Regions:
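C-lobe/activation-segment region of protein kinase-like
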Residues: 90, 103-141
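Flexible N-lobe loop architecture of eukaryotic-like protein kinase catalytic domains
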Residues: 28-32
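ATP-binding glycine-rich loop module of kinase domains
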Residues: 1-21, 25
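Conserved hydrophobic alpha-helix
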Residues: 80-87
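Catalytic-loop of the protein kinase fold
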Residues: 87-97, 102
């Protein structure tokens, strides 16, 4: 198990933290993200207990350079983000090598702090990514 603290700030309000937890719970139903077991609520933060994925992120495992990420990894990331977008209406835009972990040949997505439900206009980078342009999002570099 792993415990993550989500502090409430001017930028990350309690409502935003609620959304982050909700979206990760949805992704975990597909086994795309660590399962959340417990959320402890405090006036200034949440303490979230979840499954621990005991491996390095893709950037540390392979490189920060998207060209060094194996195609099988890109294929899994594309499948994860497509399902979250098309079935659940989730726009996950923080697409960097630091927010994906590979364990036992399976890719997991972490950090839903910048994820959101889709709006009338899809995020420009997610649109390109879902169309097959496999790069890391420069807005989060």
């Amino acid at each position: 198990m792993f415990k993550k603290t989500i502090l409430f700030t001017a930028k990350r309000t309690q409502e935003k933290a609620d959304l982050e937890i909700e979206l990760q719970q949805i992704a975990s139903k597909y086994t795309f993200a660590p399962k959340i077991h417990k959320v402890e609520k405090f006036p200034d933060r949440y303490e979230v207990t979840m499954d621990k994925i005991d491996n390095m992120c893709l950037a540390d495992m392979y490189s920060d350079d998207p060209k060094k990420i194996p195609q099988r990894i890109w294929t899994q990331i594309h499948a994860i983000l497509t399902i979250l977008y098309e079935r659940e209406g989730i726009e996950y835009i923080d697409i960097t090598g630091y927010n994906f972990i590979e364990q036992d040949n399976k890719v997991y997505i972490i950090d839903f702090g910048d994820a959101r439900y889709k709006t009338d206009k899809i995020n420009w980078f997610l649109k390109d990514f879902l169309s097959g342009q496999y790069e890391w999002n420069p807005d989060f570099a």
